[in-house]
Amino acid sequence: MPSQVIPEKQKAIVFYETDGKLEYKDVTVPEPKPNEILVHVKYSGVCHSDLHAWHGDWPFQLKFPLIGGHEGAGVVVKLGSNVKGWKVGDFAGIKWLNGTCMSCEYCEVGNESQCPYLDGTGFTHDGTFQEYATADAVQAAHIPPNVNLAEVAPILCAGITVYKALKRANVIPGQWVTISGACGGLGSLAIQYALAMGYRVIGIDGGNAKRKLFEQLGGEIFIDFTEEKDIVGAIIKATNGGSHGVINVSVSEAAIEASTRYCRPNGTVVLVGMPAHAYCNSDVFNQVVKSISIVGSCVGNRADTREALDFFARGLIKSPIHLAGLSDVPEIFAKMEKGEIVGRYVVETSK
């Protein structure tokens, strides 16, 4: 496929300091390094991590000025001089994990998210809230052809992340998984991956809109935290002993603590959501006697990415998205802060 004309300037959302003004402005289109591809980003998901990057309330080093976003889906328009395995015209995904060294002890065994030289999209590397963005060719995701780019965008972070978390829960088909924070961007995908993997799903969230989405996605038991006064007791009763696995994607410290009490003996609590400055409090006696495992799960590796995208490409996962324009990012952040989003926002970079 012949190379398309690449403009010198493009639209982007830029901020110059933590909590600084989110400016929708013209910036220069980046030039890919020898190891990078340049992607014409058609769509980008908006993740809660983007909000944390803007606030600067996670202990990550940030570059400034910074273009956020890390769920970019688009088309390859240019290759760096050393790039192999890609061609102009390929569908490509830009993940949070933009690049790693591929030679440290963590990269060698597929734990790239622990690489000490990790380059994070939307944190240390300008992200996908722009029309053209670069990504390391090794870590960029190969998106299958004929996939809807708007709908696949959230898979590139939210989908991969919850898929990896479900694998870490060590649950077998027919057992119970509880999704805490079930109907946000991550939770709505976690429900579907869990069902596709053969698990029975309980969802915890608040409000009728989220109950409706949970039921539409095929979940079995919904617990509304605004109505249920004894969430721990309700889950233990419904599952006849507790949930075999728990995926915590909520940003509530209290919800994390509760999950350690309704987890079944020998079960696994997986921490995914990262509320700023929060702690995981677990009663030691309860944890020891019940032999509960509490594990953290960050983003997935390249194999997890391929597997998560395969579920999507086969039609097993649907993205409950709301489309907006790139210029709407400030308003989306405001809704996110208020907990008003059901599903996932995806922005079209040309608007």
From Swiss-Prot:
Phosphothreonine carried by residues: T226
Q: What is its EC number?
A: 1.1.1.1
Tell me the cofactor note.
Binds 2 Zn(2+) ions per subunit.
State its location(s): Cytoplasm
Q: Which residues carry this modification: Phosphoserine?
A: S282, S319
Presence of keyword Oxidoreductase: yes
Catalytic activity reads: a primary alcohol + NAD(+) = an aldehyde + NADH + H(+); a secondary alcohol + NAD(+) = a ketone + NADH + H(+)
For the ligand (Zn(2+) 2), the binding residues are: C101, C104, C107, C115
Q: Which GO terms describe its molecular function?
A: alcohol dehydrogenase (NAD+) activity; zinc ion binding
- One Pfam family in the UniProt entry: ADH_zinc_N
Kindly report, in one word, the top-level EC class recorded for this enzyme.
oxidoreductase
* GO terms of biological process kind: amino acid catabolic process to alcohol via Ehrlich pathway; glycolytic fermentation to ethanol
The residues that hold Zn(2+) 1 are C47, H70, E71, C157
Superkingdom of origin: Eukaryota
Required cofactor names:
Zn(2+)
Q: What remark does the entry add?
A: Present with 1310 molecules/cell in log phase SD medium.
Q: Any idea what job this protein has? A: Can reduces acetaldehyde to ethanol. The role of ADH5 in yeast metabolism is not yet known, but ADH5 is not responsible for the production of ethanol during growth on glucose nor responsible for the oxidation of ethanol to acetaldehyde.
Q: Which protein are we looking at?
A: Alcohol dehydrogenase 5
Organism in which the protein naturally occurs:
Saccharomyces cerevisiae (strain ATCC 204508 / S288c)
